[in-house]
Amino acid sequence: MTISPPEKEQKKEPVLDKPIETDAIPVDFSKLDKPGFWSKSLAKGPKTTTWIWNLHADAHDFDTHVGDLQETSRKVFSAHFGHLAVIFIWMSAAFFHGARFSNYSGWLSDPTHVKPGAQVVWPIVGQEMLNADLGGNYHGIQITSGIFQMWRGWGITNETELMALAIGALLMAAIMLHGGIYHYHKAAPKLDWFRNLESMLNHHIAGLVGLGSIAWAGHCIHIGAPTAALMDAIDAGKPLIIDGIPIASIADMPLPHELCNPAIASQIFPGLAGRTVENFFTTNWWAFSDFLTFKGGLNPVTGSLWMTDISHHHLAFGVLAVLGGHLYRTMFGIGHSLKEILDNHAGDPILFPAPNGHKGIYEFLANSWHAQLGLNLAMIGSLSIIISHHMYAMPPYPYLSIDYPTVLGLFTHHMWIGGLFIVGAAAHAGIAMIRDYDPAVHIDNVLDRILKARDALISHLNWACMFLGFHSFGLYIHNDVMRALGRPADMFSDTGIQLQPVFAQWIQNIHNSAAGSTTLAGANVNLQPGLVSEVFNGSVSQVGGKIGIAPIPLGTADFMIHHIHAFTIHVTLLILLKGVLFARSSRLIPDKANLGFRFPCDGPGRGGTCQVSSWDHVFLGLFWMYNGLSVVIFHFSWKMQSDVWGLTGGNFAQSSITINGWLRDFLWAQSSQVLTSYGQPISMYGLMFLGAHFVWAFSLMFLFSGRGYWQELFESIIWAHNKLNLAPTIQPRALSITQGRAVGAAHFLLGGIATTWAFFHARLIGLG
């Protein structure tokens, strides 16, 4: 990609004199009437049906519109504001539904019996059947997004506050939309501003993350924690007394601004009495130990983390982020320079013997947004997967842990988001290698050495995949055969041939024994063994007669399914990594970089060169990601129902060790709710289950047949239309190979995800 304006010599002064260009691009509404205005060929309009597919494929490929990094950067930056606006509108809709159509107040008053609902179906031709009795004289659709639990954690106590949030979110959306227009048309940043990476890190880490976390800690301290303390006392039947009046119900709750009054707040947390500033600056920080705690474990009333622990966490994290954000050299000439760090960083001479170390890596990252995006997607995707585990192991929101459909939904959601982001990381890494990588800059540095060693990397990874696949699947096949032959003693199981996950059990014991041994002297902490998370040999957390979380025992069944996880993860990695390492060239197609990110084959006359583009690796990686994560969420769903929630009689350990057990005791047995949902409030999940299966099956039509079949069929259909003088002016064309695979993958994933959605929700909502 060309870089405009031309690169200048590195500036001595770190601060840019004028970082923006005013009135750079005038607003031109006429473009809205010209689909494909960015491309000469697309702007001519459609001659064949391929035009509409190319329009969709290239609409957001800003690189190809102008081929100018500054213009691309401005478009991406402006699009960020549009994205934020969409998020605020979406949040506003959630707040509005909570304020106008929900049973939020009813749920707050009895969260262990009333189920959350925020949508009432209108009775047109019988749809009112979907309005389930959720308790508290409310009929509606049960929601499983966790927003009620989250709002309770924020300290929201009535629908009026939700309506205020809905209006506020709409206003923020309007500001964001204006920001996107302003920073593209009126005050567009220059390329040097985008490439000023140290200032960007300072702004993002210290400003957005650090100050944002401290600001949220302030909300938690002054609103969230006092509200939680009052409401927890109500739910426990031991109301607190404020100014001589017992706070016995939500109607008695002080308004949020009243909680900021030290005279009221100090009756809940004495540390919030009027001397907080003095205590802070005299370092008398122990005075804050009643609302900045380190208790560990779960609140026995709500089955969630202590709000005072959460406040402490956000404050500490925010302070660390503010400090970390100031590590980089910006305007004062002190701190780290990323270019100096990378240019001077050479790895271990034995393990990583690249003579030029990381030289050239800074320039690659500073000029390739695809490379940066690849790294960021990989990290945020991994973080999402970590979050999915924390949602059940350390539930952050009140009463979340006993809302089983929501726990399962949040786990599944964050797993799929993480998987999609990681595949996206490989996609953008491949694009970066093709469009932004300059071999002349990378000579004997770490990236060059990895590319030179790619055959060894991929072949070894392929061996690991084969080893994991044959052995882990072989354990299941062995068990199926032994069970069929009536030889349980010869099966791999906790009662037969044991394969205990000794390392995982050791890690559980470390977490259990380490609690309480790493605390500060004099701190107000009460960490007991098992209270880092109850899943690590802790105790059972029960709320309202339901198990929120309990110790999760690991045995042979977990050992076996975890090696299936290892297998699917390694195969996904093999596909994605091969797509990146062989994006520019391969023995089969040495000039692959000239063909671009996505291409069907290496031209006519070269058989066997189809489906080798970097895009095709992303396509294949999506399937393995989806199938791998399906095993993960199935494992989680069955394990929790069996060993934690007590819904399936603890059958996981003995049933999940055979393929037949997964088919019979998980898929078949647990689909009874969705298959028999007709005539019940969960009947829409039955329809969704059928419909999503259809969408999934529809995808196979695109994936299993070639382009020529359809083009041949179209020729006959067009001939018939010509006979009747009904031929269309836009010539029908079969989808290209790449387009067909894209449509197939989209329907495969959509159908599979919606099928699983219906299966999980009907199961746990149906069980009540």
Curated annotation (Swiss-Prot):
Annotated positions binding divinylchlorophyll a': 693
GO BP terms, alphabetized: photosynthesis
Binding site residues for [4Fe-4S] cluster: 601, 610
A single Gene Ontology CC term: photosystem I
Binding site for divinyl chlorophyll a: 701, 709
Keyword Thylakoid: yes
InterPro entries in the record: PSI_PsaA (IPR006243), PSI_PsaA/B (IPR001280), PSI_PsaA/B_CS (IPR020586), PSI_PsaA/B_sf (IPR036408)
Pfam families membership: PsaA_PsaB
Cellular localization per UniProt: Cellular thylakoid membrane
Catalysed reaction, written as an equation: reduced [plastocyanin] + hnu + oxidized [2Fe-2S]-[ferredoxin] = oxidized [plastocyanin] + reduced [2Fe-2S]-[ferredoxin]
Cofactor comment: PSI electron transfer chain: 5 divinyl chlorophyll a, 1 divinyl chlorophyll a', 2 phylloquinones and 3 4Fe-4S clusters. PSI core antenna: 90 divinyl chlorophyll a, 22 carotenoids, 3 phospholipids and 1 galactolipid. P700 is a divinyl chlorophyll a/divinyl chlorophyll a' dimer, A0 is one or more divinyl chlorophyll a, A1 is one or both phylloquinones and FX is a shared 4Fe-4S iron-sulfur center.
Residue ranges of the TM segments: 76-99, 162-185, 201-225, 310-328, 369-392, 408-434, 456-478, 559-577, 617-638, 682-704, 742-762
Keywords: 4Fe-4S, Chlorophyll, Chromophore, Electron transport, Iron, Iron-sulfur, Magnesium, Membrane, Metal-binding, Oxidoreductase, Photosynthesis, Photosystem I, Thylakoid, Transmembrane, Transmembrane helix, Transport
The enzyme's E.C. designation: 1.97.1.12
MF term (GO), any: oxidoreductase activity
Binding site residues for phylloquinone: 710
Stated family: Belongs to the PsaA/PsaB family.
Subunit structure and binding partners: The PsaA/B heterodimer binds the P700 divinyl chlorophyll special pair and subsequent electron acceptors. PSI consists of a core antenna complex that captures photons, and an electron transfer chain that converts photonic excitation into a charge separation. The cyanobacterial PSI reaction center is composed of one copy each of PsaA,B,C,D,E,F,I,J,K,L,M and X, and forms trimeric complexes.
Functional description taken from the UniProt entry: PsaA and PsaB bind P700, the primary electron donor of photosystem I (PSI), as well as the electron acceptors A0, A1 and FX. PSI is a plastocyanin/cytochrome c6-ferredoxin oxidoreductase, converting photonic excitation into a charge separation, which transfers an electron from the donor P700 chlorophyll pair to the spectroscopically characterized acceptors A0, A1, FX, FA and FB in turn. Oxidized P700 is reduced on the lumenal side of the thylakoid membrane by plastocyanin or cytochrome c6.
The protein's name in its UniProt record: Photosystem I P700 chlorophyll a apoprotein A1
Species this chain originates from: Prochlorococcus marinus (strain NATL1A)
